[in-house]
């Protein structure tokens, strides 16, 4: 409550003192009384500089909250990759946060600056009810998102069949229905609001102890407990999957080394990406490749010309692939897998057989970009084929998956950290104040700061839940007409 104290003003002769009402100072007096700050004729309770800083700061928070949550809603309904059932939880969360920004925050800004409620008792009751409703819906939507992620991770096959549009909409309806059940009791009498209401009566949440316990449990402490258990389980499952994928990555590396050892003889230095091999045993040599058809040679020649043009412009560098050995009456051929990759990229393989030496060369243009070597003493040229072997592809996919799992674990920590930092101070204050004596009550500025700390969670939610999602980032850029 803002108490307007009457100030004693000294008379010119000093014989007596008279009290002047605060209204007399609004227009100033003959003795040079200072005019209190006002906006549009409404007296303010704080200095003008504080009014400006507070108004700009809080208005910026409101603007960020509105823009961010509107972008989330539009992204889900306009960007096709985001039109999936689980994203309706994000839409429900965005709607709750949007109502906080539109229906709750502006009245709090005015109340913070004026320090009096000038909108009447009906608007006061509706504002407080809307405050509890929307903030509770925002928190319960966070809880629903946590449960959805938990079921999707711990039971992915069964939950994928259960996660239907009807089920998701039913969960969202339950969130809003439960929020209404928690926020509505003060409207039907469970409150300690005064019977008479004027502009000096504070518009504040009821401090009726029974309702405070009831609403704080339903709005925060029970959802916090559920989210903590769920995210701990998700974190444990994520760490377990990280360990499993790390083991799979090590196994894949061992398989890669084994395959490389089998593909390259001991007399020839092995390379992870080498695709050419030769053996001295006639029985172990693969049969020479069949000569390509005229049509295939024509297409290969055409592709080779394109590769050569690119090379001349400095945009392409053909890999040299050479493997040789001294054998008698044997032909050395490129393995079938490597040959297929080379044919796709426009390379041609030529094999020359003599009685003393075998030369295998790979050319990438009609100008005979050929690397060859005769004799068995020269070391082979390292091979760098353009195509990626299967085991390298699997290893790359596992590496990407490990990176995603680590980011997911880090995201869980950010979600819980932001939620607790924003809302825990408010609900601790909300529960403690009704049970303590007047001397332990916090100052109005501290109350306002803690309240807005909770509101800020509505501005951060669209950032947290979308900044780590590539599809949402693309949708935002598309909506804002940013070039990607």
From Swiss-Prot:
It comes from Locusta migratoria (Migratory locust). Gene3D superfamilies: Rhodopsin 7-helix transmembrane proteins. It is found in: Cell membrane. Belongs to the G-protein coupled receptor 1 family. G-protein coupled receptor for tyramine, a known neurotransmitter and neuromodulator and direct precursor of octopamine. The rank order of potency for agonists of this receptor is tyramine > naphazoline > tolazoline > DL-octopamine > dopamine > epinephrine > 5-hydroxytryptamine. For antagonists, the rank order is yohimbine > chlorpromazine > mianserin > phentolamine > metoclopramide. It comes from the Eukaryota. It holds the Pfam family 7tm_1. This is Tyramine receptor 1. It is a multi-pass membrane protein. Disulfide bonds join 124-203. Residues 78-87, 148-167, 238-411, 471-484 are cytoplasmic. Keywords: Cell membrane, Disulfide bond, G-protein coupled receptor, Glycoprotein, Membrane, Receptor, Transducer, Transmembrane, Transmembrane helix. GO terms for cellular component: plasma membrane.
